[in-house]
Amino acid sequence: MFGIFKRKNKNKDIDPVKEKQKLVNDSIKKSKKEKKKKKKKQTKIDRFDIRDAIPFTYDEEKNMFKDLDGNYIMMVRTAGTNIFGFKDNDQYAFIRAFSRIFNNSIGAGQIYSYMVGADVDGYVADFQYFKDNLNLSNPQDRIRYEILDEAQRRLKYTALTKELVDRCFVFILKGQDIFQLEQRCQEIVATLGSYQKTSILDFMDTFLVIYNFYHPQASKLFTEMAKEADDIMDYLYPTRIGMVDVGFRQCVELDRVFCRTKFIHIYRKEPAFALMSYLATAGDIDFSMHFKPAESGALTKSLDKEIHNIERNMQKAKDASTQSKLMKQFDKTQTMVEKMVAEGDTPFDFTVFLRIKGDSVQQVNEICKDLDDSFVSMGIQFSDGVFEPLELFNCTAPILYDYELKDRFYKTTTTATLGWMYPFVFEALYDSTQYSQDVHYPPVYIGNTIQTNGVVFYDNFTKKDDRSNYNEFVVGNSGMGKTFFLMWLIYNRCGLGYKQYILDVEGKELNKLTYELDGANIDCSNGEKGRINPLQIRFNVPDSDTGDGKVPLDQIYPLEQHIRFLRSFLNAYKGDSDEIGILHTNLIERALTHVYGLINIDFKTTAQYILDNFKSEDYPIFSDVYDTIQQWLKEIEKQPHPDRAEIERHKVCLAFLEPIAYGADANLFNGHTNVDLSANVINFNLSALQDNTGSRVLATQYYNVLSYIWTDIISDPFNRRKQLYADEFSVIMDPRYLDIMMYFQTVIKRVRKYMAGLTPATQQISDVLKDSVKEQGEAIIENSVYQFYFGLGAEGIEYFKKTHLIPESEQEFVQFANIGECYAKIGTSTAMRVRIQIGDEAFNKFTRMKDDRK
């Protein structure tokens, strides 16, 4: 019965109204208990008053930040560099310069390092300009638009996700006398400026450094600053700041970002080279090193105390093994004291704080554990500040907050040791080349540095003192990423409007990529589809003697040079045959001169006349040369007393020319040129010629195509970038083809003068650097300002051990590099280990192209 019910309880009836109320109360109590239980499972956050939590303010009159004791704050930014790739002498120069920072005139300071998103806004705008100037009714322009749009979208996305990152290094100094403070900052600039780009930050840049610390999740900053002091501090204040207890440790919570601060508790007295760089670039971790002059004699006092402790332990030690270890430690410490006294090293105190960030306490703890595990082998042990999380949090902040740092945080060492622990190791590349007054060519994002995760925005047309041409050398064993890297360059450069030529010996992915880019695939093993007439005269336009331009075409007489080209062409074609000697060559050249004479071209005919009056179909072909020699033979045989030796020479020449004029190779070489070079991407497919015995025909056709491309490059009337990819150029690296190798060297030396670059690539480094052609191979590589070394294995790296091409310190990396990793030399002053990062869309396309050929 609803509302009224009875139940037995000690034979007494229960009031149903009271019973109902009791049930409600029990329900409320149960609910409260569950809530309390749930609360216990949640992270408890104690909030701080934001204004009390941040120990500095803003001086509107001076337009500077200052701490609560009235000390003004100034910052000096310095650029990172990869000194690991330097020679020993260069490394020591950087180390010595850095160690000179630690002196009494500069005094106490802080070095702060943090990760920021890569600066890509300018590149995004440049991509937009290129997109806006395309004609989308043109099929090739539509393809270019898609490539540019893909690159632009990727940059926009990674700017938000911080997939592309940079590293910022700053010194922080403070003092009440602004003039003296500026002088101290100028001393840092003067000391480091000769070695790495160093400058004093203005207020806006100083503001951004501090803002990034207190707003670690911010994805963008303001375009305008507030005028009022309170407003500026309001910009800096996070929405909330609190503390989370995690056992005996505490985390600072900053707008849902959890932060834990650690400091170096133990480090080796003889630290690893550039030790601080490993800490200063350890992922998305904020690094802060405080330093200050130590008391006179502090270091020797500390070591004397250590010696006293060792002596005491030696007296207590019972076994010989322990005594022996302590004796070695005693001798080592004593030597350090004597050295410091002799050299007069200045003692300095330093301490290092690290801020670890994460979206949860668990994530922060996992990062901390990884950090502990990573650095224990380097002799570093970290500790957490107990019951002082906010104080240590602010010690990491770029404000030189010293919190009256106690001795337990500071370590005493020498200025030389601090210099040895050099922290500014970071590598990134931001290439930028002027396109028009307000626009630059967007570079190609090729990946990130392996050691520091810096971005690599690469443009081979960047001109600097140490980057004098546009040539690239690419090498790597099969399957290590060389071909995909070439495809990535070709793909992006198509979008940027390069004119690109590809000499393709493999005939696999590159011809499919050319088709994808609406380029022209020319089958150079089938004359009906792609023939280049070797007798079509090539031009070579030299520089004028005055150095003020090129020699005019009406002052160039090209037949003589072209005959020399044909001499090298025929030498390559004959291969190992020794039947053709100098007399036979002379006879063939007389026939060549004759057939050119029939169309009114001789050694006095100018290039301008030929250009104005001759088309492809007007030139002679090899069958004309063959027929001429055959006619001469008939005339000799009709003579009353024919010269038998002369007859034999003619017959040998005919036998030599017959395959190329009427035989198996006539389809390749005997006929007029029928290729169209109007496409922006042209792939000359030579793969079907690889089966030729000794690659004789392959090398000959390679040379023929190369010379034809070279003529097109130097004759190009458009002011545009051009790049020639000579894949597997090792086919011409043979002592038999010395003329071709020398021609290749000429092209790679002179191509820059025509706004063009050459990219020789190979997986057969043994063919390029073998003893018989090593001189030519090294010359080709050294003439490439940009060099990319993918994995070579033990056998491949052996060829570099007797050269200066790869530093000894990098040879092991190149030997064991993973797929897609390379050692990159960018000019003479920049080198880095790079992990190639191809965009997802392009990578999927390339993978399909690779799979389709199987």
Predicted regions and their residues:
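Extended, folded cores of ATP/NTP-driven motor/assembly subunits in large transport
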Residues: 2-415
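P-loop NTPase motor domains
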Residues: 2, 62-67, 74-82, 88-107, ...
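Glycine-rich phosphate-binding loop of nucleotide-binding enzymes
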Residues: 441-526
